[in-house]
């Protein structure tokens, strides 16, 4: 049973690492230059702090996911994994939420603040950001599954209901 638990955990962590890496890479490659009423406009992920936060958060999640694979079952480090998984899940939730909010402003603008939508002018850039968000949601969902599976694995020995 321990081998099966380790295998499932490893597969989930590798999938989460892959999705996190994809999210960060897609966001980093989001860049477009266009002309708008004769004015050259450049859209780049590094111009938006929440997008930079997104890249850093998913790079951290990628590295953590790979490091977590090194923890031996039953070791002190493996006991800290659940807490660390929750922390990484919260980090990713914040990154996806911040990026989603700013993306919505880029897509629809904000009439009250006087911010115009930009996605009509830089469609490839906005598509890249959307792709990064989708990969980010997948990674976040996988982290949720990792947390639920880890909770189950921790609680199972405590339950005498078998």
UniProtKB/Swiss-Prot annotation:
InterPro entries with a match to the protein in the record: CASP/CASPL (IPR006459), CASP_dom (IPR006702), CASPL (IPR044173)
Keyword Transmembrane on entry: yes
Keyword annotations of the record: Cell membrane, Membrane, Transmembrane, Transmembrane helix
Location relative to the cell: Cell membrane
GO cellular component, one term: plasma membrane
Membrane topology of this protein: Multi-pass membrane protein
Transferase listed as a keyword: no
Extracellular side: 29-50, 101-128
Cytoplasmic topological domain: 1-7, 72-79, 150-162
GO BP of this protein: multicellular organism growth; response to auxin; response to brassinosteroid; unidimensional cell growth
Transmembrane segments: 8-28, 51-71, 80-100, 129-149
Listed Pfam families: CASP_dom
Family affiliation: Belongs to the Casparian strip membrane proteins (CASP) family.
Complexes and interactors: Homodimer and heterodimers.
Name of the protein described by the UniProt record: CASP-like protein 1C1
């Amino acid at each position: 049973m321990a081998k099966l638990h380790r295998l499932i955990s490893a597969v989930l962590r590798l999938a989460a690492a892959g999705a996190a890496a994809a999210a960060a890479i897609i966001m980093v490659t989001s860049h477009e230059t266009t002309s708008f009423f004769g004015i050259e406009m450049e859209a780049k992920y590094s111009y938006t702090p929440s997008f930079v936060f997104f890249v850093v958060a998913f790079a951290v999640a990628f590295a953590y996911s790979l490091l977590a694979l090194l923890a031996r079952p039953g070791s002190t480090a493996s006991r800290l994994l659940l807490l660390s998984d929750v922390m990484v899940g919260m980090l990713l939730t914040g990154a996806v939420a911040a990026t989603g909010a700013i993306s919505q402003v880029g897509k629809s603008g904000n009439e009250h603040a006087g911010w115009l939508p930009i996605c009509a002018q830089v469609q490839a850039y906005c598509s890249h950001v959307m792709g990064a968000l989708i990969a980010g949601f997948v990674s976040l969902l996988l982290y949720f599954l990792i947390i639920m599976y880890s909770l189950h694995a921790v609680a199972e020995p405590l339950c005498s209901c078998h």
